Amino acid sequence: TPGDTLNINSGGAAVTSNIGPSSDEGSFDVAGSRTVSYDHIETLGVSGPGAGSLTVSGTNGDDDITVVGTGVDDFTVSVNDSPAIQYTNFTSLTINAMSGDDDIDVDVNMLAIATFDVNGDLPTTSGGDLLSVSGTNANFSPSATDAGSILVDAQTIAIASTEQVFFDGETGNGTLTVTTPAGATTTSLTPGATIDSGDIQVASLLGLTFGNLGATGSVVLDDADAVADDTLVYIGSG
């Protein structure tokens, strides 16, 4: 059976979602209102008419956070074994994964909100936090060892305090573009086990692993400035 349902209308105010100790427990903080706590609720939905901002906080353990686009400004978010909470008419989403080696999975679909920030925070091990994004076309722009941005289809995601990024092209035969920063930069490309997978490392900045581009998918390296001063190193398997 579908169980109990809780629906909240934020009235456009900022919303913070906090996971509880059990999968069906947690709370919502709506700016200007009292905290709404829930327990043993199986279906949850929050609407923020056209101007809502949402912050989702993980735990200090190793979390699995999943975001699935269900519309241009609609999406679901689940944390670990929690229900996938439906958020409708939100224009801003911030994921604060907190401490631990967290996995943040984003299936963009038609999502195109104005602001989407992923903050991995402090890792537990050297492997650290992993952001995986699925779509057809992407443009990845690293800016620091743990930061950058990735545009997947119509959605830009700002990345901070994150150690690994993976792009899944869903065999859509799209184009993956990696934009290198201005100035002379060395980029390494290591092919993967399949023709549509591999690893790209721009200098010592945040690296990118990609897969499932499709048999006719392509990879483009694009220098941010007009001066032809970059170097590409192709690392073969032989």
Show where each model-derived region lies.
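Acidic, glycine-rich low-complexity segments
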Residues: 1-238
